[in-house]
Amino acid sequence: MNPPAYTSTSGSVASTGNCAICMSAISGLGKTLPCLHDFCFVCIQTWTSTSAQCPLCRTVVSSILHNITSDANYEEYEVIFDDEGYNEDAPLQIPEEPGVNVSPQPPVHSTANSASNTALMRSHAQPRVLAPDNSSVFQPSTSSHASFSSGFAPYSQTPPVGASNLEATRVSRSAVITPTTSTGPRLHLSPSSRSVSQRLQTLFGITKLPGVPTEPPAYAQAEAHFGQANGYGQHRGALHGSYPAVLTAQDTSQIPTRLPFRATDRDVMEVLNSHVICSLCWVGWDEQLATLFPPPIVEPTKTLILNYIAIYGVEDVKLKVSLRCLLHDLTVPFVENMLFLIDRCTDPTRISMQAWTWHDTPIRLLSGPIKSPDGGSTSQDTSVSNIHRSPPGGSSTQPSSGRRPGRPKGVKRRLFVDDDTGVSTNESVFPVINAPIHHKNSKLAALPTGSTTDSNERLVVESPGASAEQPSTSGSSPSPSRRRGRKQGIARIEMLTKKVRRK
């Protein structure tokens, strides 16, 4: 089995594969111990802030290797949890290795803002031996992590850029740094007057180190050997033990039903074609979301993630920031967050109608032009928009459901003047019926004499006295015979209306 290829860029070793969390090329390599899976360091560091398990194999992650420049020069980010069953007073048990002097240090409690990130990194002068020695590979013991369990982190994480509104939700969490056993310097990060970029640079270890080796490091060989010893291969291009083979978008029918969703849209298929997905990548999505959110909002979370992907695209930086804000904050309002992002989507072509399925149930994503908060649309085509807003300073002219513009709701009262007496009388007049009247053929015989139906099924009532008369010109008063015919026609219409209403 060939190990994955690695290249050296910007002073540190980088992997040529894709990150399983953000589904994009790995930027800033971070490897999890003991399973040795590759991720973006920012992505896996954010992931481990709420869960101690590897997102691929569900192994308890003890630390993350990053800033790897050689076999003997790298930095390690420790994943520390203060969950149930974990003794905070007891130091973390790390297997003793030859040539490493253990010097325990007292715990240090943060005196800065309680919303600080308590990530703990250490630079190894004498790191762990991961190269094969006498046909054996050092495998860190997992007995020290038996008390670890996935759940919420007791400490807060520095929110990503653009997520300052989530800072208030993290104030109630306390920052505690536990002792570590290392001969290298200890680095404690706390918020201060430094800028956000400086804190991120210190937190994520973005440094330029010279002397980068050109050959793959020894831990790549250890990764291949470790995978074979545990019954599964590497993440990309191999099987994961008893799980199904590596699946691509062309073979989505073989994906188990326990997966959170299955993509069926053509655009999504093209995205998945560039990233080979194995079934183990999706194992535990339900369990992971269940540990992050209450059960009633697990399904809305999945739908919201799909909308994020539809709006921003898989390779957009905003998608990563949005997913971090969504998956690592317990009080995020899903609907408001989604509408906030949609209202600020200036490119309506990025949003297309996509169909997703979850347990064979279709989920329709957002589509069409987006209504901005001020009432204007981001696209010229507003036919698919269902948002109706009242004009400022006036009532809305949008008709209600089931009514036509200008159509009265009931019988309209019309004023007629009797030319003989000069007294105005109120007569109930039913408005002109423009819509087709659906009636049974058996009822046609019940129509009054002189009433017919035209080609559009419009009811036409002709009065006997006025049938032979020509229509009067505009401005002339109607004759008495026409007035009598009009009243008779009105009476017949009212009678038909009452019969229809009774039925």
UniProtKB/Swiss-Prot annotation:
User: GO terms for biological process?
Assistant: protein monoubiquitination; protein polyubiquitination; symbiont-mediated perturbation of host ubiquitin-like protein modification
SMART domains per the record?
A: RING (SM00184)
Which positions are tagged coiled coil?
none
Compositional bias (Polar residues): 375-388
**Zn-finger region bounds: RING-type:** 19-58
Q: Which GO terms describe its molecular function?
A: ubiquitin protein ligase activity; zinc ion binding
Q: Which Gene3D superfamilies match?
A: Zinc/RING finger domain, C3HC4 (zinc finger)
* PROSITE patterns linked to this entry: ZF_RING_1, ZF_RING_2
Q: Compositional bias of type Basic residues: which residue ranges?
A: 404-414
- Taxonomically, which superkingdom? Viruses
Keywords, in A-Z order: Host-virus interaction, Metal-binding, Modulation of host ubiquitin pathway by viral E3 ligase, Modulation of host ubiquitin pathway by virus, Repressor, Transcription, Transcription regulation, Transferase, Ubl conjugation pathway, Zinc, Zinc-finger
**What PANTHER family does the record tag this protein with?**
E3 UBIQUITIN-PROTEIN LIGASE TOPORS, TOP1 BINDING ARGININE_SERINE RICH PROTEIN, E3 UBIQUITIN LIGASE
The protein depicted here goes by the name: E3 ubiquitin-protein ligase IE61
Source organism per entry reads Cercopithecine herpesvirus 9 (strain DHV)
**UniProt lineage:** Viruses, Duplodnaviria, Heunggongvirae, Peploviricota, Herviviricetes
